[in-house]
Curated annotation (Swiss-Prot):
Binding partners and assembly: Homodimer.
Pfam families attached to this UniProt entry: Aminotran_1_2
Encoding gene per record: hisC
Catalytic reactions on record: L-histidinol phosphate + 2-oxoglutarate = 3-(imidazol-4-yl)-2-oxopropyl phosphate + L-glutamate
Similarity field: Belongs to the class-II pyridoxal-phosphate-dependent aminotransferase family. Histidinol-phosphate aminotransferase subfamily.
The protein, known as: Histidinol-phosphate aminotransferase
Native source species: Oleidesulfovibrio alaskensis (strain ATCC BAA-1058 / DSM 17464 / G20) (Desulfovibrio alaskensis)
Signal peptide: none
GO MF assignments: histidinol-phosphate transaminase activity; pyridoxal phosphate binding
Cofactor dependence: pyridoxal 5'-phosphate
Domain of life: Bacteria
UniProt enzyme class: transferase
Pathway participation: Amino-acid biosynthesis; L-histidine biosynthesis; L-histidine from 5-phospho-alpha-D-ribose 1-diphosphate: step 7/9
Length: 383
């Protein structure tokens, strides 16, 4: 049995310091900087945030009206299991309601799958490197071995190495498509082939948080194929194309029997009543959703062209963000450019946390934000 970690010299009571070693060594998730932080730090009145892959159009008008209409219900507990939201998701995505697991963001579903599938001291979990940090954070917090497989130099998936890292004790394998932070998006046939090659007891979790932004989602999403592959689960979120990042709402789709196990251990009422109403309204407002996709795809084309023209190495993206490396003759490194943009009121994402210190990631904004970013960025490149 693993002994609790103790910090003898901390001066704190042992009841406080005798904690699990996984917690003592835990490094929490590092979120992007907020607009208020930068305003206060640099004394700015206006700040443009292009770091957290949020919706460039904000929140749907129908969602806003729905929240106003139902605000007086905030004192009520939500109906257990969110059946109305589950039904709306099932209709919108063409899946069986009994296969849907809703969560307080897709992060909660990630955590639940790990807890349900992986046993500490026995199982392992496999993902690519770099990957979304929540896969590693929650795996290590649960005391489970976390294995990572390097991406290829062009950030495509090395499937042979990935399958080679898995064994009979691999409980879960995570992939993200489109991938974060590169935006790489493989054809669905490759994901299906991977599902066939993994050990039979391994659950392949395909995180499709950014799938809506692909030019042709049907060519890349495994969601329509789930009934053929009981060893695959798909994650989706309302944070990106549906504009509900602040309400924390996501879901997973998986085999009904697995969904039942996951729902058994989910904390009650983890989705609040207003988030449920907002999620249903977001699915209903198809006009806003379509406009979001159009603006994002147009902005992605514009930023890709402008950054390429500026001499950057731009990695092809199917998501609502772009990863790029600075021109070879740039007088600044990536960290310096990030900090200089902060002082000018523009927040993008440095990628040192992904072990990519030479790269930056910019979220697609609206037209004004995109043009402002490019103007300020080019001015920095001129020294």
């Amino acid at each position: 049995m693993t002994e609790p970690a103790k910090r003898e010299d901390s001066g704190l009571p042992e009841a406080v310091t005798a904690i699990r070693p996984e917690v003592a060594a835990f490094k929490p998730y590092a979120p992007g900087l907020s607009i208020d932080e930068i305003k206060e730090r640099y004394g700015l009145s206006q700040v443009v945030k292009m770091a957290s892959n949020e919706n460039p159009l904000g929140t749907s008008p129908l969602v806003q009206q729905t929240l106003r209409t139902h605000a007086d219900l905030a004192f009520r507990y939500v109906q257990s299991g969110n059946p109305r939201l589950v039904s709306a998701i099932a209709r919108s995505f063409g899946v069986a309601a009994e296969s849907v697991v809703t969560g307080n963001g897709s992060d909660e579903v990630i955590d639940l799958i790990i807890r349900v599938k992986a046993r500490p001291g026995k199982h392992n979990i496999v993902a690519f490197n770099p990957c979304f940090s929540m896969y590693e954070l929650q795996t290590r917090f649960c005391g489970v071995e976390f294995r990572q497989v390097p991406l290829r130099a062009d950030f495509s998936f090395d499937y042979d190495a990935f399958v080679g890292a898995a064994d009979a004790d691999t409980a879960v394998a995570f992939i993200t498509t489109p991938d974060n932070p590169s935006g790489y998006c493989p054809p669905v046939e490759e994901i299906i082939d991977l599902a066939r090659r993994l050990p039979s007891s391994c659950l392949l979790v395909v995180d499709e948080a950014y799938m809506d932004f692909a030019d042709d989602p049907a060519a890349h999403s495994v969601l329509p194929h789930l009934t053929e592959f009981p060893n695959v689960a798909v994650l989706r979120t309302f944070s990106k194309s549906y504009g509900l990042a602040g309400l924390r709402l996501g879901f997973g789709v998986m085999h009904p029997a697995l969904a039942d196990y996951v729902k058994r251990v989910r904390l009650p009422f983890s989705i609040n009543i207003l988030a449920e109403y907002a999620g249903i309204a977001a699915l209903q407002d198809t006009t806003f959703h379509a406009q979001t996709l159009r603006v994002t795809r147009e902005g992605r084309t514009y930023l890709t062209g402008a950054l390429t023209e500026a001499g950057c190495t731009v990695y092809p993206s199917a998501a609502n963000f772009i990863m790029f490396a600075l021109p070879e003759n740039c007088p600044h490194d990536a960290r310096a450019v990030f900090e200089a943009l902060l002082r000018r009121g523009i927040i993008i994402r440095p990628l040192s946390s992904y072990n990519l210190p030479q790269c930056l990631r910019v979220s697609i904004g609206n037209r004004h934000e995109n043009e402002l970013f490019i103007a300020q960025f080019k001015e920095l490149l001129r020294g």
